[in-house]
A protein has these predicted regions:
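A short, conserved beta-to-alpha structural element at the edge of catalytic cores
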Residues: 23-24, 73-100
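Cofactor-binding active-site loop characterized by glycine-rich and histidine/acidic residues
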Residues: 1-74
């Protein structure tokens, strides 16, 4: 019964499933998860509140403008950490930011007040010779996969420390959807 309150028609826009978004829930098409993270950060300034964001909705202005508005209002609150999964695809089409290069993506976040942008690009670790800007890390050999995984873990650790130390920070992980539901790209 509780889930009925959170369905799109009478509850949170974009949550058709009725699942109540948590702090680590994906941001969804209009970035609801990020608002829970920002609220948590405001209320509990000694804890980190990460939220995941997919690039499928990043073409919408709401996600980054909400971060910028929040930072303008509460510049001292930086203990929330967006983690962007940048894979070039929405569920059914290319994402609006799929044609950006790394420098443009970094500039996009910096334009919205993010002082530190930590971008981990799987392409930098590709030992399988994949073409295109987005590569599938599940095709890497063992050493390349370990190096990429290490870079992600170290990047997230550095980002967490940065966010908890008063610097507005984002982590961006750039790789093709390669495993799970999307066996190859976003087919």
């Amino acid at each position: 019964q509780l889930q009925e309150r959170f369905r799109e028609r009478d509850g949170l826009l974009g949550h058709l499933s009725g699942a109540i978004p948590g702090l680590l829930a994906p941001a969804g098409p209009l970035g609801q998860g990020q608002h829970f993270a920002m609220a948590g950060a405001y209320l509990h300034r000694d804890r980190l509140f990460p939220c995941t964001i997919g690039d499928g909705g990043l073409g919408e202005p709401y996600i980054l403008s909400a971060f910028k508005h929040f930072h303008t209002s509460y510049p001292e609150v930086t203990n929330f950490l967006p983690v962007l999964i940048w894979n070039g695809f929405s569920q059914e089409h290319h994402s609006m930011v799929s044609l950006m290069d790394n420098e443009q993506m970094v500039a996009y976040w910096r334009a919205h007040d993010f002082e530190r942008v930590i971008l981990i690009d799987a392409k930098d670790y590709d030992d399988a010779g994949q073409e295109g800007a987005y590569v599938d890390s599940t095709r890497f050999g063992p050493e390349a996969r370990r190096a990429f995984t290490r870079a992600v873990l170290e990047g997230v650790k550095a980002a967490a420390d940065s966010a908890l130390s008063g610097t507005l920070t984002v982590v961006i992980v750039k790789q093709l959807k390669g495993a799970g539901v999307h066996a190859q790209g976003a087919k």
